[in-house]
Amino acid sequence: EHIEQKKAIYERYKEGLKGLPVSMNPMDLENSEPNYWLSCLIIDKEAMCKQVRGEQDVCYVKESGKSCPTEILEAIASINAEGRPIWKPMHMQPIYRLNPFVVRDGNGRAKSNAYIAGDVADVGMDIFTRGLCLPSDNKMTVEQQDRIIEVIRACFE
């Protein structure tokens, strides 16, 4: 019953956010059976407004037709709903910051610099930058979830 409630939450988000430049949790339904623990989204790269996340502070610049996780989290917090950033990858944590980590092209240390041309090869950092966990409590009402969806849609206007 719990998994069915979580699945219904996920499906309502997926349907309600259709048409926005976002992707919901990717899953391989042929080879796995998801538990729908969290409903998460990732904003498409071209739909991201400018955002910088520090250790404790974050700032962003609102752009028409674009949004970022910080804007969405602030917007849903304004209606008393709680989301959160996707977990920060281990190699970005202060204690591990200087250690090597693996990316598609080998060691990722010193390849995630703003001055190096090209796409980010660090998939974990990219997901952290563009993703967020949506309110997913199974005690949330359909009306509350509809309001959250409405607020998220407004962030992209």
What function would you assign to each model-found segment?
Residues 1-157:
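PLP-dependent aminotransferase class I/II
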